Amino acid sequence: MTDWIRILKEQTATGEEMGRDVPKMLANPDISEAQVKTLFSALEQQADFAEKLRLALEKFGHDFPVIKAAERLEERYADLAASAAEKLKAMRQ
């Protein structure tokens, strides 16, 4: 059986690390448009995965605090992806 709580904990730790690293990457004046596009794509994939994880946790009847943690993770990745999209937009102007 899949250990959804373990997956959530691992993904949350990764999300926290990304929350620290992504702003630094985007602030780097040497980052290329291709790198930002790749980062955006990866963050979008993580946001999609976090959404699927949340849906699985809901489906299997996990408690509200667990679902809430998954929602926060999903929001974190969506926010990071939005930051990358804004950087990409600024680079194209």
Model-identified regions with their sequence ranges:
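Short terminal alpha-helical segments
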Residues: 1-31
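Short, low-complexity interaction segments enriched in Ser/Thr/Pro/Gly
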Residues: 6, 34, 84-86
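Short amphipathic alpha-helical heptad-repeat segments
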Residues: 7-18, 36-53
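Generic detector of low-complexity/intrinsically disordered segments
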Residues: 10, 28, 45, 59, ...
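Amphipathic, soluble alpha-helical interaction motifs
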Residues: 21, 25, 52-56, 60, ...
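Charged, low-complexity interaction regions
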Residues: 25-36, 58-68, 93
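Amphipathic alpha-helical binding modules
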Residues: 66-93
